[in-house]
Amino acid sequence: MWLAVLALLVLPLITLVYFERKASQRRQLLKEFNGPTPVPILGNANRIGKNPAEILSTFFDWWYDYGKDNFLFWIGYSSHIVMTNPKQLEYILNSQQLIQKSTIYDLLHPWLGHGLLTSFGSKWHKHRKMITPSFHFNILQDFHEVMNENSAKFMTQLKKASAGDTIIDFQEHANYLTLDVICDTAMGVPINAMEQRDSSIVQAFRDMCYNINMRAFHPFKRSNRVFSLTPEFSAYQKTLKTLQDFTYDIIEKRVYALQNGGSKEDHDPSLPRKKMAFLDTLLSSTIDGRPLTRQEIYEEVSTFMFEGHDTTTSGVSFSVYLLSRHPDVQRKLYREQCEVMGHDMNRSVSFQEIAKMKYLDLFIKEAQRVYPSVPFIGRYCDKDYDINGSIVPKGTTLNLALILLGYNDRIFKDPHHFRPERFEEEKPAPFEYLPFSAGPRNCIGQKFALLELKTVISKVVRSFEVLPAVDELVSTDGRLNTYLGLAPDEKLKREAGRHKYDPILSAVLTLKSDNGLHLRLRERRS
């Protein structure tokens, strides 16, 4: 009896001593990195924040405190480095070995499997090479037709929602637009999310994205084993099955249609249409001389839908929100639209006209500087690495802070001023500005994303004057209304004057505003 009690007391102590010794060895290797002092067992978990919004704010504070450079923090005995030094970012992103994603991406495996986002090693290399032609110019033109069609529907939805000077949450509306675009381009199947927001598949997408964000920063639910014991697990399983059944069903129907000369396509409206979809390119692709398996096709289609939906929602939403706060910028954009589009401002914009919109391009670059759709990229060190002379031990997670780069005054003059012209006057050096990452694991769909962003914003600017939720929120001096990256005294001053419609930025896998992005729309009269 006493031996059992003694074992219960001693075993945790031995375990604690083991982890403390391992962490002490790692701290010695990492001593050149500045950061907040960890406490036993917790590390810095007691100071980092309780939710993604608080954690993002803490990261900005620590970054400022430690010279706007890399910094080290600990969650328990797990070491994490927030990387912001362009030279070291260049090494990491160009590395052919340091390509394993951080453990936060494990939350995506039940849904996405091991597609391009979550895989590594030889599978990732082969699939990357195979998928690259899917974003060829000719295929993008087919995708652009889908973007134009859905942008027109989106304007109709916005006119109804914003009638009578109503304040709307633009982030909420953009979510359904981008879901329609991505499902149509990925599989050739319209799901009509803008009109049927309560459909089972639309709700499944929303619920799955919420679940991933919720679990990412929960100390216990991040574990699959622990999560399986919670009340939310059964609903999660149902959501997962809905998404899997939907995608596999479309794949099987498309295979049947191809094998039967498309004869069934004319009789089943849920089948993919004749425009080239991402699914079609996968069905005609090979790896090592063989066709892709159904599971491989499922993984890549699901990955494309996840990456192309959440990130583009963020990009479109924050871009239009910035228009509401910066009317001078909006006027310049509208003038350019008039010059390029001519008298018929209601028609669809062509591929060639998009290319002529130079100020729109500058605007999107500046919007992505201050509100990057993907604020952080995670890498896991599967062995010790020498990163430009700094030894980073095995087991360390690297958080590549793309969002912090945009607020670094050593890279961008007056970073808290929103000024698209800066990208025309002085271009940042490589790896100082990374809205779509860089290197071998850069965003494979960046041309797709930029085309959708430009198409939607062009249509919004031509259709509406975008206004802030209340007039007092107009920026009269071009300053951003964020307090992130400011000196402590200025941050306190800005926080004290926070308006209820100022966004509360939250960063998990993509950037969002926890309280929405509120604005008004006034229809333009031609």
Curated annotation (Swiss-Prot):
One of its GO terms (molecular function) is monooxygenase activity. Keywords: Endoplasmic reticulum, Heme, Iron, Membrane, Metal-binding, Microsome, Monooxygenase, Oxidoreductase. Transmembrane segments: none annotated. GO terms for cellular component: endoplasmic reticulum; endoplasmic reticulum membrane. Signal peptide: none annotated. The keyword Iron applies. It is a peripheral membrane protein. It is found in: Endoplasmic reticulum membrane; Microsome membrane. Heme binds at residues 307, 443. CDD domains: CYP4. Its cofactor is heme. May be involved in the metabolism of insect hormones and in the breakdown of synthetic insecticides. This is Cytochrome P450 4e3.
